[in-house]
A protein has these predicted regions:
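Short S/T/G/P-rich N-terminal loop/turn motif that feeds into the first structured element of a domain
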Residues: 1-82, 89-96, 115-250
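Polyanionic, intrinsically disordered low-complexity tracts enriched in Asp/Glu and S/T/P/G repeats
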Residues: 110-111
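Ligand-binding face of N-terminal immunoglobulin V-set domains in extracellular IgSF glycoproteins
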Residues: 99
Length: 250
């Protein structure tokens, strides 16, 4: 991979937001992986309702929202209760959202409502990279499970490892258990907030170098798909992971 670059935008008088990654990726459609717990769930849901119009205004669309249920396997230190995946037309449009003063006011609710918040921008493996207009239809008979993978060190080397991650092996694993990969992605860009006057930079923390969602007609299929003996043999040496059922709500 070439030397990582970045794009940026001033979002307040003293803070510039940047996305660090390869320009050909972060200037393309991206998927924001929000993986978190809540302090006050009702406040978070209120924030979502209020912020939706600002996200839609810049072309953002929700791909998936769900609450984790039964843990399947892996390191529970990586576990969170909620997963939200949002598609953005490009990194530039996402930075436009961060600079929206109304969105910034609404984000006060999110900060108050969530904890152990992991956020990173991913590139999807496969299509569509940019979701079509219109709401997706949720089949109540579908069952989902998520696999979150953290690579050994979140550095330029780990981005290279994520780029070469063997998604085809997970596809075959899903098929063996009568399941299908609904969504698969890997890290493309990390958000960094620069405090201009203090010359300080704060990178938003994230746990998820790779995210994979599978779905099936039965809960047993997705549980079996991400059982520990199935997953561990497919991951790079030193990688950690967590897998859980997810109840889709959007």
């Amino acid at each position: 991979m070439s030397k990582p670059e970045h794009i940026g935008r001033k979002i307040t008088g003293s803070i510039t937001a940047e996305i660090h990654g390869e320009l050909n990726e972060i200037e393309s459609p991206l998927f924001a992986i929000n993986w978190f717990d809540t302090r006050i769930a009702i406040v978070y849901h209120l924030y979502n309702l209020l912020a939706a119009s600002r996200v839609f205004k810049i072309g953002g669309k929700v791909l998936f929202k769900g609450k984790c249920g039964q843990a399947i396997s892996g390191n529970t230190d990586l576990a969170r209760h909620y997963l939200l995946i949002v598609n953005y037309p490009s990194g530039h449009r996402f930075l436009e959202l961060l600079s929206d003063k109304v969105f910034q006011l609404m984000s006060v609710l999110r900060i108050a409502a969530v904890k152990r918040f992991s956020f990173v921008l991913h590139q999807r493996q496969g299509e569509p990279q940019l979701l079509p207009d219109g709401k997706s239809v949720i089949d109540p008979g579908d069952h989902y499970a998520v696999l979150q993978v953290r690579l050994p060190s979140q550095t330029n080397q780990s981005k290279a490892e994520a780029a070469s991650f063997d998604f085809s092996a997970l596809q075959r694993l899903a098929e063996q258990h009568n399941s299908q990969v609904f969504f698969a992605s890997r890290v493309a860009g990390q958000v960094v907030l620069n405090k201009d006057k203090q010359n300080e930079a704060d990178a938003m923390p994230f746990l998820t170098d790779v995210t994979v969602l599978v779905k099936s007609a039965t809960a047993k299929n997705v549980l079996d798909c991400f059982a520990s003996d199935q997953v561990e043999n497919l991951l790079p040496a030193g990688a950690e992971y967590f897998a859980a059922q997810v109840k889709r709500t959007m």
